[in-house]
Regions:
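Ribonuclease/tRNase effector modules and their secretory precursors
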Residues: 1-94
Length: 94
């Protein structure tokens, strides 16, 4: 799967870097999502846990008819969104 990243116009670096997230973490969550939900304007939200144990939300747009996608952003889940994700995961396991 080819993964492309939104580049921050100010730095020229992937936008995820501004959130302290690496490409390896994003790609791991995309390959092993706990949830993959529809977003707005054709985007999708993959939520999952990295190998290091961090919980991330990755917002991406799949390319039509191709094995590739465009990552808009990714960031660590914290607070109430993290609690809600964990609650949904517990309910799924029952």
């Amino acid at each position: 799967m080819e993964v492309r990243y939104y580049l921050d116009p100010d730095t020229g670096q992937p936008h995820i870097y501004g959130h302290g997230v690496t490409e390896a973490e994003v790609e791991y969550v995309l390959r092993h999502p706990g949830e993959d939900r529809p977003g707005s304007d054709g985007s999708r939200h993959a939520l999952g846990q990295t190998e290091a144990g961090r919980h991330l939300r990755v917002i991406y747009v799949p390319d039509e008819g191709a094995e590739s996608l465009f990552v808009v952003t990714g960031y660590e889940l914290r607070g109430k969104p993290l609690q809600a994700y964990r609650r949904r995961q517990r309910r799924r396991r029952r």
